[in-house]
């Protein structure tokens, strides 16, 4: 039976670039992958055709030979009759396409390093500014304490793979070419576990929860990340463990807002204090301190208290506390208070008194000029 053209199998033109071929391969491989078509022999056969076409058309030498001689270029040694061995190496195929998803890859595979873990830690502003030590509990994979990560039953050892003789690779003949592929027997590790550990069933790792004490340095902020080396999941078969990353999130504070190493807060004062000046108490993270408010203070004025902010997590200068004054309009006035305010307003020369309310005069002068310009 004549073999189908490789370009037709992938649905690309004979002038297709490599990226087009890879894109077509990914789409078709996902569609016909055996895991998605279990028990479907036609899909498995189609999948093998797709792999065969892909391996030829993405190799410049093989593609040139195929374009010149067609399938005859690979008949000696036979792609179809043993060139790829009995059955497709699915993990190796998807090592090219999806990387770590299926764990494939060329050549002997080293035991995989343990996965990194992430823990989201919420802190109060006070904890973030001063630093704190917290205990956390995380689910993870730890090295099996029976086989000590080897995966083999105590008293036994992993055996050298008889197919690849420990290299993790097998050589396949494809017409004019000899190529190396991941050993399908040991999946590239070079060893096999004949007598698996009864506790971890040959994986070398077991699921556990562990408690860690995490020291948070003073000055951290939302988005900062603390790395605990080697506290991630244990690696496979004795490989190094991954790391644990603690992601910091600082809760909103009822009084202070943080911007870099500076803190901001709003301080309400009554209009008499704003006009006459005086002394008030304002909060800081270290307690209350006194602040002198000069007379004629307007809403929005910022008072800087140096060194009352946050010390940089990287060392160096400490930030400041900036207090923004908000002048409050009095509410709930009794008749006497209203009368006094009325007399005060009259003493100003009305609502827009020029001398006592310079900003009001400036505003209304601007409004008058605006309308005068419109009527010209």
From Swiss-Prot:
The gene is dnaJ. GO terms for molecular function: ATP binding; heat shock protein binding; unfolded protein binding; zinc ion binding. The J domain is necessary and sufficient to stimulate DnaK ATPase activity. Zinc center 1 plays an important role in the autonomous, DnaK-independent chaperone activity of DnaJ. Zinc center 2 is essential for interaction with DnaK and for DnaJ activity. Residues 5-70 form the J domain. Keywords: Chaperone, Cytoplasm, DNA replication, Metal-binding, Repeat, Stress response, Zinc, Zinc-finger. This is Chaperone protein DnaJ. Zn(2+) 2 binds at residues 161, 164, 183, 186. Binds 2 Zn(2+) ions per monomer. It comes from Shigella flexneri serotype 5b (strain 8401). NCBIfam families: DnaJ_bact, PRK10767.1. InterPro entries: DnaJ, DnaJ_C, DnaJ_domain, DnaJ_domain_CS, HSP40/DnaJ_pept-bd, HSP_DnaJ_Cys-rich_dom, HSP_DnaJ_Cys-rich_dom_sf, J_dom_sf. Transmembrane segments: none annotated. SMART domains: DnaJ. Homodimer.
């Amino acid at each position: 039976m004549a073999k189908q053209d490789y370009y037709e199998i992938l649905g690309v033109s004979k002038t297709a670039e490599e990226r087009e071929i890879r894109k077509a391969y990914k789409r078709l491989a996902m569609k016909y992958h055996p895991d998605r078509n279990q028990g479907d022999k036609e899909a498995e056969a189609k999948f093998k055709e797709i792999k065969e076409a892909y391996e030829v058309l993405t190799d410049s030498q093989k593609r040139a030979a195929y374009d010149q001689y067609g399938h005859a270029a690979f008949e000696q040694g036979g792609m179809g009759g043993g060139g790829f061995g009995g059955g497709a190496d699915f993990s190796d195929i998807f090592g090219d396409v999806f990387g770590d998803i299926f764990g494939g890859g060329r050549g002997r595979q080293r035991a995989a390093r343990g996965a990194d873990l992430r823990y989201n830690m919420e802190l109060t502003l006070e904890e973030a500014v001063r630093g704190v030590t917290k205990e956390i509990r995380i689910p993870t994979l730890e090295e099996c304490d029976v086989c000590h990560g080897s995966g083999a039953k105590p008293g036994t050892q992993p055996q050298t793979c008889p197919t690849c003789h420990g290299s993790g690779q097998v050589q396949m003949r494809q017409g004019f070419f000899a190529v190396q592929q991941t050993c399908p027997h040991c999946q590239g590790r070079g060893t096999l576990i004949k007598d698996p550990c009864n506790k971890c069933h040959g994986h070398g790792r077991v699921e556990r929860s562990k408690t860690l004490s995490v020291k948070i340095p003073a000055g951290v902020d939302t988005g900062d990340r603390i790395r605990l080396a080697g506290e991630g999941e244990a690696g496979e078969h004795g490989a190094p463990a991954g790391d644990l990353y603690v992601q910091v999130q600082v809760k909103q504070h009822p009084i202070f807002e943080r911007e870099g190493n500076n803190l901001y807060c709003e301080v309400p004062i009554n209009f008499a204090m704003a006009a006459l000046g005086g002394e008030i108490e304002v909060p800081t993270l270290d307690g209350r301190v006194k602040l002198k408010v000069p007379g004629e203070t307007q809403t929005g004025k910022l008072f800087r208290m140096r060194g009352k902010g946050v010390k940089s997590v990287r060392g160096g200068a400490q930030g400041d506390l900036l207090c923004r004054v908000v002048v409050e309009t009095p509410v709930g006035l009794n008749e006497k208070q209203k009368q006094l305010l009325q007399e005060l307003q009259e003493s100003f020369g009305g609502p827009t008194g020029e001398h006592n309310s310079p900003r009001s005069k400036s505003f209304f002068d601007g409004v008058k000029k605006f309308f005068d310009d419109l009527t010209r």
